[in-house]
């Protein structure tokens, strides 16, 4: 077979000689046929090879993607192993403790307090020993050495400062169970002025106090700022203002004259009278005026005085002794301010709520200890210098007589209801030429705005104080059978006048919005008076008319019967009668 193939390759036809032409032709024809078959089969082989190549390329891409996924999975597994190792190492570390810095030593060690023990430990080089402060919190490693400085403690117990000890670094405090304890002052408190009675934050384990905690029980009851109210803003109380200025300002401004005449300055002033007539307003103006007088005497640009406003009802506490303690703190605060030569006004508003007559049986008798506490503060062993006590009340008959006697509340000033002249003065504080006035009203007075305002006030006051049928308010019957008709002028007050002016201004605004007529008119004032009177028709709504009359400022025979005479806002008669309860015990 191999020899046959060699003969074919040499061009020799098998079985014949090399010189046979017919054989050579046949052989060549056969060779041509073979070549033609091979040529015909070559595209099919090419397609097979191309398909194989594509298949191999697809397999290669799949293997590469799978290899990439395996590589990513390996990387993620490695990262997780590293993270888990770090977590295991972190969890295997010993806990870090905390301590409180006490003091630094010359050898570079520090004394700390931790776990109820006082230790001397080393300090990490990363911590500056000189920058550590008393009471500062520290982080400790497992060997209890300092590795990091932290902030000061921010939580703990509340204690009350009793006194600071002589070394200036320790203090005597009282806990909530009245237990006394000596504590250390942390660095933040060494540069702060703290006073006995202040509430401090104590970390009980280390014995450090860190900061002063504002106490709402005292801070909210005491207003130390001087009110920005002057006597010129108070109308209709000229005589009362002069009396209180003589009682409060003269002793402080001219102490030498008082000493020369051997005259003792008054310790207190009682302002009493019906509600809404300016008692609290006068007390606020006293502190402001006193500050200005101090500036004039000392030659300073601004004077300084303190106004301690004690809110009587909020001072009451359900715990025995708490109210007395707060009164002591108030006067202690006043003495501290006054010791600097600054006048201090201690103002008790609604004084009857705290200092009622002892043994009256009309309350829980808590005043049996509250009243003596105030008496001891006013004229006890510790004198009050540059401190004036001012009390305000509309039920002075309920205040304990021991407080009202001379030597305590020496000066008693009655704040009366305003008469017609006083009402004009009060109206003048709220009705000024600066207000927008209606052109028709101004035109009636020849364009003079001052005359217009004066005329409006005159008209309003005349209507308010007229004893006319529409101004009748009450008919009272006394115990002896006499009857009396009371008018609205008998119950007028500065607060009511302010409210009337406010109503009139609101009416002027509504007229401008609805009718584009700008300016205040006298008709607005007159209508405001009518509305104010009618709105007060329910004022005497009480089961005890005698008590109501005392509050309203009506003195005289005991009242047993009240009948309202006012006509309702819709024109219907709303007259009502009110009977007294039996044996009220109140005589006017």
Swiss-Prot record:
Chain intervals for the UniProt region annotation (Docks into pockets in the proteasome alpha-ring): 587-588
Example of a GO MF term: ATP binding
Top-level taxon in the UniProt lineage: Bacteria
Tagged with keyword Chaperone: yes
Basic and acidic residues composition bias: residue spans: 1-10
Matches recorded under SUPFAM superfamilies: P-loop containing nucleoside triphosphate hydrolases
InterPro entries on file: AAA+_ATPase (IPR003593), AAA_ATPase_domain (IPR050168), ATPase_AAA_core (IPR003959), ATPase_AAA_CS (IPR003960), NA-bd_OB-fold (IPR012340), P-loop_NTPase (IPR027417), Prot_ATP_ID_OB_2nd (IPR032501), Prot_ATP_ID_OB_N (IPR041626)
Pfam families for this protein: AAA (PF00004), Prot_ATP_ID_OB_C (PF16450), Prot_ATP_ID_OB_N (PF17758)
Keyword Calcium in record: no
Binding site for ATP: 276-281
Keywords in alphabetical order: ATP-binding, Chaperone, Coiled coil, Nucleotide-binding, Proteasome
HAMAP family per the UniProt record, alphabetical: ARC_ATPase
Subunit and interaction comment: Homohexamer. Assembles into a hexameric ring structure that caps the 20S proteasome core. Strongly interacts with the prokaryotic ubiquitin-like protein Pup through a hydrophobic interface; the interacting region of ARC lies in its N-terminal coiled-coil domain. There is one Pup binding site per ARC hexamer ring. Upon ATP-binding, the C-terminus of ARC interacts with the alpha-rings of the proteasome core, possibly by binding to the intersubunit pockets.
Family, per entry: Belongs to the AAA ATPase family.
Annotated domain remarks: Consists of three main regions, an N-terminal coiled-coil domain that binds to protein Pup and functions as a docking station, an interdomain involved in ARC hexamerization, and a C-terminal ATPase domain of the AAA type.
Protein name in the entry: Proteasome-associated ATPase
Originating organism: Streptomyces avermitilis (strain ATCC 31267 / DSM 46492 / JCM 5070 / NBRC 14893 / NCIMB 12804 / NRRL 8165 / MA-4680)
Higher taxonomy: Bacteria, Bacillati, Actinomycetota, Actinomycetes, Kitasatosporales
